[in-house]
């Protein structure tokens, strides 16, 4: 960009394809006795805001300014907070398509960018994919500025750092890397920044796409990052020393490094008394184990180890099985596929009919299958319990991994019996211990053993949770060095 207004406008018109882009606008006017132009994208700016705070002051500037003074005079005349100078045409175009207005004047090298964004966006609403029992009923939305504000309202401290950067080679999008300066593990932060620098893609559509570009083991069945739309959950992980990634246009945020326990815990556990939190965690753990192992164990015992079952139960199964034309493994596979189909359909249909569709479809199909003597009733109960267990898993990605593992474990149990199940679970545990998330052990703090809070599978009292993080060695890794309940004379 040079000082020739006509040449600069021609260059911008070419880069913006104004001949075929009707929403790329330019207005010419005079300010400080010089010809000037303002470029903006209709729909991304507030027209009233630009007219009142930008154009009106500049059009009424009748003074004369030299080429070296014009930029400073415009800055003084316009009462806007965010004003930046840019000299590269690509940077100027990036400012325009992000909702800024760009002012060019004759004799001024480069352009001045003014933040006059006013695009319509969704307001703050409760989380749509994570139910809230206790805690704030606020969820992230598609505006990165709103999402950053929600986190800063929960953690009002200058130690909360939010580094803004652009990601995407052809169509960049804003990305914010947030962490607590005094709690984050510096090696994990450096590793994340290095990975972000090495991401080369034309455009990042969603936070889920970014997850696939950053995770340590892209072919692993288990997710290695936490995705959430609850600000309180993201804030609690920031306090643990983890890093939160916010992408403009995505209502979820990405948290890493993460462990398996982070995928099983919920903010409601922390907001509840430790006895209640322990009960809820044990129920979720039971649901996960039922979802993963119950169908395979049923098939293995009925097919390979019937002598291990009670006589009355075995007699009932054999009597009903005699009238069914399919084998037990095939029955189980068909019913699991049917229940997964019902669950997927209930998600895709409109929300007002989704829950009704899931309940009615499950009841009708199950009853029809039993009456048609395609399956026996006990198998329907096993499939229903395992399906409920998979929906009790709080993380959506982990729930999908459990449902896929359920089918793999069913295959192992159908071929090798209980021995196949034991071998599969052993291989799963070995794989779990070898996984990492941003270089941190995914099975932390159990493997490898390290100092940690007692808050693992069970919910321990809050005042016993002194360690800040499991996944790194931050400078300040203690949440409290004194007694949290200092008033309690019993020393708790």
Residue ranges and their predicted role:
Residues 297, 310-492:
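Generic detector of multi-pass transmembrane helix bundles and their immediately adjacent loops
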Residues 288-308:
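Hydrophobic alpha-helical segments embedded in or immediately adjacent to the lipid bilayer
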Residues 1-293, 311, 431-492:
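Membrane-embedded alpha-helical signal segments
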